[in-house]
């Protein structure tokens, strides 16, 4: 799964409704940029081949890219209407430009059945949406979405430009009619006391002991599914966007984020149907603190989204030490 995190809060954001400079859309595998040096897995960038194929780790189709590419691409976002209002349909237009040439990027690798994954998260982390803009003929992506409430949001753009590396770019947005401040929008995350949640008749358990997530260390994130009524293991999860599950993991300050998927290989054979009852995601939490994990899965053609909140400790830190520090902390004056 993805461990590298690309954050570009300095990305250009244009909330003016102006037209973007048009590009020329081209077929994915035609006229590949000269920077393309191989085929890589978007989830495992170290998996590189000289010819098209699939990832030996997760089974994903490899896409043209440069495993040595480190430059962050430039993303420009515009909205129509210019002022984004809660409860009103808004058209988002997204244009991507090459970091070195400034030219419009029009070729993208398909990652989990889509060219672009667009996450909309409210600043207080109570709202979460996973959308997929469509690629227009002029090379820009377009999405229509209605925000449910006024406030501050962070928009995460997850895509794979042909000839580059995986990108995960964050862009802030404040709606019209929001009269609060940053402090009022700040989340107050607390680790879940129960790691079992219910959604659409499915009991979902995050099977991890408290204190097991350590900053800077790779960790398994195991999820177990049971039928809510019968208690029987769920074995009929459906593939949604090419995987049996999706997870967005986001730090409380929104500076660290990972878009992850479970391993899809079992004894060397790609699973095509009948997912469950257990999925294992892999993640590396870059720094300590509270994180929210949004898990998405599909069963009986119904897509469910469940949030979990977990604590990530510093290396050498334990929950007992953390509680002791809080008990002896000097009161604020």
Residues of each region from the PLM?
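Intrinsically disordered, low-complexity terminal tails/loops enriched in metal-binding residues
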Residues: 5-7, 11-333
């Amino acid at each position: 799964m993805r461990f590298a995190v690309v954050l570009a809060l300095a990305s250009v954001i244009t909330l003016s409704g102006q037209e973007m400079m048009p590009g020329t859309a081209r077929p994915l595998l035609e006229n590949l940029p000269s920077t393309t040096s191989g085929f890589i897995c978007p989830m495992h960038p170290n998996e590189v081949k000289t010819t098209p194929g699939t990832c030996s780790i997760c089974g994903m189709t490899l896409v043209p890219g440069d495993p040595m590419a480190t430059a962050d691409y430039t993303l420009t976002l515009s909205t129509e209407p210019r002022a984004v209002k809660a409860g009103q349909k808004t058209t988002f237009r997204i244009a991507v430009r090459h970091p070195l040439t400034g030219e419009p990027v029009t070729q993208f690798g398909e990652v989990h059945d889509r060219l672009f994954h667009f996450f909309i998260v409210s600043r207080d982390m109570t709202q979460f949406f996973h959308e997929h803009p469509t690629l227009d003929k002029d090379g820009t992506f377009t999405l229509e979405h209605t925000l449910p409430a006024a406030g501050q949001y962070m928009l995460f753009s997850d895509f794979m430009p042909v000839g580059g590396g995986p990108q995960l770019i964050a862009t802030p947005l404040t709606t019209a009619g929001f009269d609060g401040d940053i402090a009022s929008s700040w989340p107050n995350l607390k680790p879940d006391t129960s790691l079992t949640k219910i959604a659409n008749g499915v009991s979902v358990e995050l099977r991890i002991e408290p204190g097991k997530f350590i900053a800077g260390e790779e960790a398994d994130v195991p999820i177990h599914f049971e039928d809510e009524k019968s208690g029987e293991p769920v074995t009929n999860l459906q593939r949604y966007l090419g995987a049996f599950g999706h997870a967005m993991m986001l730090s409380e300050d929104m500076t660290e984020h990972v878009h992850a998927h479970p391993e899809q290989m079992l004894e060397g054979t790609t699973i095509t149907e009948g997912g469950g009852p257990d999925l294992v995601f892999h993640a590396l939490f870059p720094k300590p603190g509270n994180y929210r994990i949004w898990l998405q899965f599909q069963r009986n053609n119904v897509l469910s989204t469940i949030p979990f909140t977990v604590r990530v400790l510093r290396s050498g830190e334990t929950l007992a030490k953390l509680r002791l520090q809080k008990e002896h902390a000097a009161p604020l004056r």
